[in-house]
Design a protein with these regions (language model features):
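Phosphate/pyrophosphate-binding active-site segments
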Residues: 2-3, 140-143, 178-180, 200, ...
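Conserved structured core elements
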Residues: 5, 28, 223, 230, ...
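N-terminal alpha/beta PP-like core and its mobile active-site loop of ThDP/TPP-dependent enzymes
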Residues: 2-339, 381, 472-475
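Active-site diphosphate/adenylate-binding microenvironment
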Residues: 8-11, 16-18, 26-29, 34-36, ...
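Short acidic loop-to-helix transition motifs that present clustered carboxylates
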Residues: 31, 51-56, 78, 392-394, ...
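Thiamine diphosphate
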Residues: 98, 106-119, 226, 328-329, ...
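Hydrophobic "anchor" residues on beta-strands that sit immediately upstream
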Residues: 213, 384, 448-449
Length: 582
């Protein structure tokens, strides 16, 4: 390796070392020189329809491969992406946002140039991003540029959240030392003197538990403890649930897995069992209202051991600066030697289950009270499944997942439209892993997207990117004439919850899909059975799209149905009192 290289070459070499194979984005005059170095560095350039979609796609890519990256231009481009960057921050996707900026001379002279507020101020956009990224750097000096890049990327890895790198156009080809590339970016976790004390208290709680259970949340992925948590579940054989965010990270085929815990919305026997537990091992908590069924699924603190990034809570006592991965690894080793609570007989607790078409009249119209447990039969090992914010996001929580599957479901940010470009990014990451034989031995892996019509209209352009890259994506579009999730919450008869009626199955052709690309529509169970039985849909390649037509008030069982029922009950009460409410 030469002793020096161009700054852009250094940046892209580092990204390749982190496992990044593709960079998303949109070209703009302040990043064009930077883009010249993407493909020579061995990276694939993915040009998206707009910067928002590019950032969504980089997020989806990051959740599968660990790190994603996008490049935008200064001002207009980066602000278009910032909503998605905020979502990645909230739900902990490690996205590197690289922004091409005006030359240093223009910034220093405060020139009034395009893509600015025309006031000579160049730092506002970076200040905005400081609120939604964990580290930011503006490269100004070739002598310090490589260290700045490494420091920011280290924080991206350590915290699994977005970072922000500004590259002035006049620094792109500046020579920098290459020596640092000979070593990977070093990660240093704090080691607390109290590790043994924490571990001893955890072991004591586990040994004395009489009704223990396990609750797994989605932050085990960025924490890097998915494997350890799975081993703990396997060894203890204790009843296990996930939150919506945690679903899809575990092996759901084991007998002690019971699906998503819905708190007060769950079956009475499940809610009672959790409430009566004397120990809850909670891994990777992300306790937002939308991830905990309005906070009702949060376990009682006094019986909970909660494992977060660098903190363990044992009951109401908090131990800070604790390396959680080390603790969970120690726990895996110790469990085999402990006398654990063994459920014999095992408690009678419901598990997720599929439905069969044999149990349903094929002439009946589709309805979401049964749809999702039937669609579960379509899923294959290794599928990446995405359920968009809306009825689809609630529905996919009901689906038992096969081995090695992943699930993206609404968690906290809930920006509708995310899942379509997110599916593009996830499918691309999936293909890169299969091509390098790193995907569980599966060769024909699929990405399966469930999305409502309203969300689809937000980001439909990324069908074109999926088609251009020939990604293996199956799209199930829920056509319910608008925002049914909003109808359930408020205004179920109001026009503001309607959307334009599109001919959705013409979209693949419009966006350039090859002639013969599969599209199909189902209104009845019989029509859906025929579609799901098609080899072309199940085992084909490239884009396939299926429209599922349901009623405008149709929703999966659970909170949405209850919200709608309460809304209608209030309306009946208002009418009985001689008033009228929407």
């Amino acid at each position: 390796m030469a002793s020096t290289m161009k700054l852009a070459e250094y940046l892209f070499s580092r990204l390749r070392q982190l496992g990044v194979g593709s960079i998303h984005g949109v070209p703009g005059d302040y990043n064009l020189a930077l883009l010249d170095y993407v493909e020579p560095a061995g990276l694939r350039w993915v040009g998206n329809a707009n910067e928002l979609n590019a950032a969504y796609a980089a997020d989806g890519y990051a959740r599968i491969k660990g790190v994603g990256a996008l490049i935008t231009t200064f001002g207009v481009g980066e602000l278009s992406a910032i909503n998605a960057i905020a979502g990645a921050y909230t739900e902990r996707a490690a996205v590197v946002h690289i922004v091409g900026t005006p030359p240093r001379s223009s910034q220093d002279a405060r020139l009034l140039i395009h893509h600015t507020f025309n006031d000579g101020e160049y730092r506002r956009f970076a200040q905005m991003h400081s609120q939604v990224t964990v580290a930011q750097t503006c490269l100004r000096d070739p002598r310090t540029g490589t260290k700045q890049i490494d420091d920011v990327l280290r924080e991206c890895l350590r915290q699994s959240r977005p970072v922000y790198i500004e590259v002035p156009v006049d620094l792109v080809s500046a020579l920098v030392p290459s020596e640092a590339l000979q070593q990977s970016i070093q990660m240093e976790d704090p080691i607390a003197a109290s590790v043994s004390d924490v571990f001893d208290q955890i072991v004591h709680k586990i040994k004395s538990a009489q009704q223990p259970l396990i609750l797994v949340d989605g932050e085990i992925r960025p924490m890097g403890i998915v494997g350890e948590v799975q081993q703990i579940i396997d060894v203890t054989a204790w009843p296990t649930w996930t939150t919506p965010f945690g679903k899809g990270l575990l092996n759901e085929t084991i007998p002690n897995f019971h699906g998503v815990y819905q708190g007060s919305y769950d079956a009475p026997e499940v809610h009672a069992f959790v409430q009566q537990a004397d120990l809850v091992l909670c891994f990777g908590p992300h306790f937002s209202s939308t991830n905990t069924y309005a906070f009702s699924s949060i376990p009682q603190p006094e019986v909970t051991i909660a494992f977060t990034d660098h903190e363990v809570k044992v009951g109401t006592k908090t131990f800070r600066d604790v390396p959680t991965k080390a603790i969970t690894s120690m726990l895996v080793q110790r469990l085999n030697t402990l006398e654990l609570k063994r459920y014999d007989p095992y408690p009678s607790l419901p598990r997720e289950h599929k439905l069969s078409f044999a149990d349903i009249d094929g002439a009946d119209s589709l309805s979401q009270d049964r749809l999702w447990r039937l669609l579960a039969n379509f899923l294959q090992p290794g599928d990446i499944v995405l359920g968009e914010t809306g009825t689809a996001g609630y529905g996919v929580r009901e689906m038992p997942l096969p081995r090695h599957s992943r699930l993206f479901t609404p968690v906290t940010w809930l920006s509708i439209g995310y899942m379509l470009p997110g599916a593009q990014g996830a499918a691309l990451a999936q293909r890169e892993l299969t091509e390098s034989s790193q995907y569980f031995g599966i060769e024909n892996a699929r990405t399966v997207l469930f999305i409502g019509d309203g969300s689809f209209q937000m980001t439909v352009q990324e069908l074109g990117t999926i088609i251009r890259l020939n990604l293996n994506v199956v799209v199930f579009l829920i056509n319910n004439d608008g925002y049914t999730i909003e109808r359930c919450i408020h205004g179920y008869r109001q026009g503001y919850n309607d959307v334009s009626s599109w001919r959705y199955l013409m979209a693949p052709s419009f966006f350039g899909a090859p002639e013969g690309t599969y599209t199909g529509s189902a209104r009845t169970w019989g029509e859906l059975e025929a579609i799901l039985g098609s080899d072309e849909v199940c085992d084909g390649r490239g884009l396939r799209m299926v429209e599922l037509v349901v009623g405008p008030e149709d929703a999966p069982k659970g909170p949405l149905v209850q919200f709608l029922q309460k809304q209608k009950a209030r309306e009946r009460t208002s009418r009985s009192w001689g008033t009228d409410t929407p």
